[in-house]
From Swiss-Prot:
This is CaM kinase-like vesicle-associated protein. Does not appear to have detectable kinase activity. Its main location: membrane. The modification Phosphothreonine is found at residues 446, 470. GO terms for biological process: modulation of chemical synaptic transmission; regulation of modification of postsynaptic structure. It is a peripheral membrane protein. PANTHER family: SERINE/THREONINE-PROTEIN KINASE. It comes from the Eukaryota. GO terms for molecular function: ATP binding; calmodulin binding; protein kinase activity. It comes from Mus musculus (Mouse). Residues 24-286 form the Protein kinase domain. Its cofactor is Ca(2+).
């Protein structure tokens, strides 16, 4: 086996923590990201320095899924513009991912430090990103979170290459994808509109990156009153869906027509008409001599410092508003069924009673009894698990199941298991849990992550009638977890509300 890890699905042959420390010296934490801590590690045998990402399994299913996803994707890829996987260890409590160490700077910092910056410099950056993305797309891998923060220089040499990092959201395109994820300002229209999507979303993001590098401005942005986040979000998604951006004067006055043409083709609203990464590499602005050599540093840097140093547009998008925007196409169809569901769930056993009654009405008395028993026996366990997750440092570890948003440490957003939004910590939108199941040897379904604190149930034990009688609560009022994350305090609730929360949680447990 080329790396130190065991097969991800193996439940027995874990690495011992000593295997990690015997081979690597781990320094102090140099950065904390959404799902992991990042260390600078030294190989005791070769003396080489690497980046180590440590994921704690106890932080929830989202974290375990992110680690497994990044490991799986990085094992598949080998490209000069992608940070390469060096080693992996999986212990009972952690995932350790060792990567090449990039010692260069982020692209923004590099631009600000240059005495001379032109379209040709931008063309060189975009070309390398396109080549890496074209390679990923040839493997049917969608990165889904391309942004300037994930582009770094490999070293500090003058002609250093660009490398792409952060693959925890990358996904194999086995059919079109529906779950929304990414960073809001880089989201393609099909993601905002909750359509099925695929590789073209990466090309849209490259168009946004190119727009910023040439003008210093994000394409979808306008000045709003301080803290007027709701209008910011509303305008952001409206403009993305319409492709409403312009090449404003004076910022684009010195930019070539060829550059504008490539941006336009990358940011085509209709995904089936959008230029591919492979096609973009052949564009005259990338492969020809159409990129201007005129110095545009002063104008670009002034706008970068205005828009990005203050980081206004990069601030975490407000949870509730973004959830409503991303779920807008579903909202009208689920509002009526949600009202009926709320009326049928007045107390602690409301969910179980409603399910049992519906099953009985459908002629499945035995199924109704099973539904009631399942909800009753698992309600307490679901509430206990929810309580544990709320007490955890990662408030986003347990997604809400009522369509509400569950904020994390900075109010940014990630979708939960039902397509609702729970917060991340870097402004990106990420799927919360892995709903897939690992088939056991006897044909039963077992949960994909055995370390989860929330008990799972076999899908065969769930009555079909109950599932049909319990509509997805897609647009319910935000629950106590969401309010707690937004205010820093748990809101007061009546016993009836607590009991309803238990019933809702039990439904989530059953469907997981």
């Amino acid at each position: 086996m080329p790396f130190g890890c065991v097969t991800l699905g193996d439940k027995k042959n874990y690495n011992q923590p000593s295997e990690v420390t015997d081979r690597y010296d781990l320094g102090q934490v140099i950065k904390t990201e959404e799902f992991c801590e990042i260390f600078r590690a030294k190989d005791k045998t070769t003396g080489k320095l690497h980046t180590c990402k440590k994921f704690q399994k106890r932080d929830g299913r989202k974290v375990r899924k992110a680690a497994k996803n990044e490991i799986g994707i990085l094992k598949m890829v080998k490209h000069p513009n992608i940070l390469q996987l060096v080693d992996v260890f999986v212990t009972r409590k952690e995932y350790f991912i060792f990567l090449e160490l990039a010692t260069g700077r982020e692209v923004f910092d590099w631009i600000l430090d240059q005495g001379y910056y032109s379209e040709r410099d931008t063309s060189n950056v975009v070309r390398q990103v396109l080549e890496a993305v074209a390679y990923l797309h040839s493997l049917k891998i969608v990165h889904r979170n391309l942004k300037l923060e994930n582009l770094v220089y490999y070293n500090r040499l003058k002609n250093s290459k660009i490398v792409i990092s952060d693959f925890h959201l990358a996904k194999l395109e086995n059919g079109l994808i529906k779950e929304p994820c990414g960073t809001p300002e880089y989201l393609a229209p099909e993601v905002v509109g909750r359509q099925r999507y695929g590789r073209p979303v990466d090309c849209w993001a490259i168009g946004v990156i190119m727009y910023i590098l040439l003008s210093g401005n994000p394409p979808f942005y306008e000045e709003v009153e301080e803290d007027d986040y709701e209008n910011h979000d509303k305008n952001l998604f409206r403009k993305i869906l319409a492709g409403d951006y312009e090449f404003d004067s004076p910022y684009w006055d010195d930019i070539s027509q060829a550059a504008k043409d490539l941006v336009t083709r990358l940011m085509e609203v209709e995904q089936d008409q959008r230029i591919t990464a492979e096609e973009a590499i052949s564009h005259e602005w990338i492969s020809g001599n159409a990129a201007s050599d005129k110095n545009i540093k002063d104008g670009v840097c002034a706008q970068i410092e205005k828009n990005f140093a203050r980081a206004k547009w990069k601030k975490a998008v407000r949870v509730t508003t973004l959830m409503k925007r991303l779920r807008a196409p579903e909202q009208s169809g689920t509002a009526a069924t949600q009202s009926a569901s709320d009326a049928a769930t007045p107390g602690a056993a409301g969910g179980a009673i409603a399910a049992a009654a519906a099953a009985a009405a459908a002629g499945g008395a035995a199924s109704a009894s099973g539904a009631s028993a399942t909800a009753a026996t698992e309600g307490g366990a679901g509430c206990a698990a929810k309580s544990d997750d709320i007490a955890s440092a990662d408030r986003s570890a347990t997604p809400a199941t009522d369509g509400s948003a569950t904020p994390a440490t900075d109010g940014s957003v990630t979708p939960a298991t039902d397509g609702s939004i729970t917060p991340a910590t870097d402004g990106s939108v990420t799927p919360a849990t892995d709903r897939s199941a690992t088939p056991a040897t006897d044909g039963r379904a077992t949960p994909a992550t055995e370390e989860s604190t929330v008990p799972a149930t076999q899908s065969s034990a769930l009555p079909a009638a109950k599932a049909a009688a319990t509509p997805e609560p897609a647009v319910a009022q935000p629950d106590s977890t969401a309010l707690e994350g937004a205010t820093g305090q748990a809101p007061p609730s009546s016993k009836g509300e607590e009991a309803t929360g238990c019933a809702q949680e039990s439904q989530r447990v059953e469907t997981s």
